[in-house]
Amino acid sequence: MGKVLDLALHPLELRAALKLKFIRQPLFSTNDTRATPQLERCYELLNLTSRSFAAVIMELHPELRNVIMVFYLILRALDTVEDDMTIDPQLKVKVLREFDSKLDTTDWSFDGNDLKEKDRVVLTEFPCILGEYHKLKPEYQKVIKRITGLMGNGMADYILDENFNLNGVQTVKDYDKYCHYVAGLVGDGLTELIVLAGFGSDDLYHGKNSFQLYESMGLFLQKTNIIRDYAEDLDDGRSFWPKEIWSEYATKLTDFRDPKNTQKGVDCINHLVLNALTHVIDVLTYLSSIHEQSSFQFCAIPQVMAIATLAKVFNNPEVLRKNVKIRKGTTCDLILNSRTLKGCVDIFQYYLRDMKQRLPVEDPNYLKFNIQVAKIEQFIEEMFQDNLPAGVEPRETMIYLKVQERLKWDTQVIPRVQEEDYKFNMALSVVFCVLLSFYFFTK
């Protein structure tokens, strides 16, 4: 009932939800996801573990759909081992370190998870996933195995790191390193897969600054989640906020839960948001380098969700008490409006300006925050250069040329969006006429 009321109070979001549900069509047919019982079961497992990820994976180009589905399930299985506190640490470390080698088998499975672990089925039915993994092109298998090995060993290292287990994340450098292992590596693997498929520019993975770009894609998402999950993580007896930042505002991380320390907690949240915003320019550069439309949407949707979530947690004391989320209708609106690069940039600008407007002058990082937002705004100006005086030619910078290339693909998307708007407006007109007729003839 709450979600329905939310939509009713936000008519533009209601419009977006209806368009997404009834009007918008996927780019590709999904019939081939049921080609065999084994493949169909893998997609069922995907839906069981994450409906949101399943939705975006299902809309991918057939060349990458099964690849990324298998990649996700393998990393989910790895994460399910790492997350389960009932598994003996020695056994857990062994399984994590050897996980990539299990991909060479056809029948390995693991039933050592707690029976209450909701995702244990991914491990008990792992042979099903292995069957689909071995059907992938060798170059795709190689990427998945490499990332699985790096991530498994990274997880094992953190389990054995007594200082981390006792004191949590200490420095901003440690914070970035932790986010690298849990999210940056995913960005690494996905980027290589996209480039191998020919769906992104070659320099996206092999360029001089490519590591920084795909690393930022992962870190921006992970840092957003870490900021948002403060209360939930503390309830679970853990936290990933870096001490280098939070110690500027409190003696203990739990101090922020005391109502008298709320303002200090909010100042810390804003500082962490500022840290996350340092990745935005890289994120926009990365998105400018994706050509194939379904891959673009796959990459863009989580990023626009992240900037919307950052705006939600920004200057928000509720974060200290509970997990805050963006509205369902907002999510629908973001999905529809992030199908073009210009649409994504508009979303980023909207939320950046919203945060800037709400930033209190008394905030300890007021000046730094404004400088960071100004840097991003200036970069966006360089991306498009569409407000130049008459007679002035745009500077052909690297990002400008990337954007011009991406805009060629955007022009193919715009007619599709316009057609959806037309169909929705026609449907709305029909419904309105029917209701009006009903009212007129029954009066």
From Swiss-Prot:
Q: Where in the cell is it found?
A: Endoplasmic reticulum membrane
Look up the domain of life of the source: Eukaryota
Give the cofactors, semicolon-separated: Mg(2+)
Offer one example of a GO biological process linked to this entry: isoprenoid biosynthetic process via mevalonate
Q: In which pathway does it act?
A: Terpene metabolism; lanosterol biosynthesis; lanosterol from farnesyl diphosphate: step 1/3
Please report a single Pfam family linked to this protein: SQS_PSY
Write down the Gene3D superfamilies for this protein, in alphabetical order: Farnesyl Diphosphate Synthase
GO CC annotation: what is one? endoplasmic reticulum membrane
EC numbers listed for it are 2.5.1.21
Please classify the protein's predominant subcellular localization into one broad category.
Answer: endoplasmic reticulum
Enumerate the catalysed reactions.
2 (2E,6E)-farnesyl diphosphate + NADPH + H(+) = squalene + 2 diphosphate + NADP(+); 2 (2E,6E)-farnesyl diphosphate + NADH + H(+) = squalene + 2 diphosphate + NAD(+)
| Entry GO MF terms | squalene synthase [NAD(P)H] activity
Membrane topology of the entry? Multi-pass membrane protein
SUPFAM superfamilies assigned to the protein according to its UniProt record, in alphabetical order: Terpenoid synthases
**Keyword Transferase recorded:** yes
Keyword rRNA-binding assigned: no
Q: Which spans are transmembrane here?
A: 181-201, 294-314
Q: Which UniProt keywords apply?
A: Endoplasmic reticulum, Isoprene biosynthesis, Lipid biosynthesis, Lipid metabolism, Magnesium, Membrane, Multifunctional enzyme, NADP, Steroid biosynthesis, Steroid metabolism, Sterol biosynthesis, Sterol metabolism, Transferase, Transmembrane, Transmembrane helix
Q: What InterPro entries does this protein's entry cite?
A: Isoprenoid_synthase_dom_sf, Squ/phyt_synthse, Squal_synth-like, Squalene/phytoene_synthase_CS, Trans_IPPS_euk-type, Trans_IPPS_HH
Function in brief:
Catalyzes the condensation of 2 two farnesyl pyrophosphate moieties to form squalene. It is the first committed enzyme of the sterol biosynthesis pathway. Required for the biosynthesis of ergosterol.
State the similarity comment. Answer: Belongs to the phytoene/squalene synthase family.
Q: What is this protein called?
A: Squalene synthase
